[in-house]
């Protein structure tokens, strides 16, 4: 059993990450922070690369670094308690597959930044495919407060 959170590095996803960490602590289950990357453009029939010359390894390293930085910044001393996972594929598919593999109790996602109260394409996909509850965090949500911390004090 786990809590799975999708992290894309955006401010709303960082808020979702903090909330997911709090949920994982309350439930006494591991936190899994997930990021996805799409493979770079392929080669046409002639064998010459089109588009970017980045490789899958470049994309993976960049995504892993961004996820590690986000978790470290948002969770501080508790960052080492999060299991970080980076996979190639569409974000919604990666989140659902991770949730299934880890028997997630909860999936936490940020709402689309442009529409704070509406789900984006990733969250719509996850909402329809998830086998567990999904918490959708509005993009304007304040950072969560731990249950044992008085209101007004910042979560560290």
Q: Which stretches of residues belong to each language-model region?
A:
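A short acidic, glycine-rich active-site loop
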Residues: 51-66
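General small-molecule cofactor/ligand-binding pocket signal
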Residues: 32-34, 83-87, 135-137
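Short, well-ordered secondary-structure micro-motifs
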Residues: 16, 43-46, 96-97, 118-120, ...
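Small/aliphatic-rich secondary-structure junction motif
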Residues: 1-53, 140, 155-156
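Structural beta-alpha unit
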Residues: 12, 72-107, 142-156
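Solvent-exposed polar/charged
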Residues: 25, 100-101, 128
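Glycine-rich, Arg-bearing micro-motifs that act as flexible, cationic patches
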Residues: 106-128, 139, 143-146
